[in-house]
Amino acid sequence: MRLKAIALAAIPAAFLGVMASAPSASAWSAGNCPVGQFCVWPEFWYGDTDMAPSLTTDEEWSGSAPGHIFYNHTSRDVTMTYVVAEGELQGRTYTTCVNKVSGSYFTMPMHVTDVTWREDDGTPCY
């Protein structure tokens, strides 16, 4: 019985650990991201901005772009891969789907490493 209680207590802790590094689900404005582009900004901002994005692409991309905010200003869903920025070291890698014409922010500094067009397989993109 004691083991079951410990196991049940560990589930919320594990969930919170994953959620701390996940992108926020709230909507974000396009800022200065041109229509038809996927953009990532290196620093946090709110409302409009003239800050230059660290990544602006209209095609599939791989590399490393520092990011706090991202916006998909295209007509297609995107699969985005990112890693937790841990100083000079690379942290855990995550992948998420970004809806067309939507954006959000990371709750901690990240590096976006891959952007690909998502194949429409009928499953929703959150």
For each predicted feature, which ranges?
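N-terminal prepro-regions of secreted/extracellular proteins
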Residues: 1-39
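Post-signal peptide N-terminal regions of Sec-secreted extracellular proteins
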Residues: 27-126
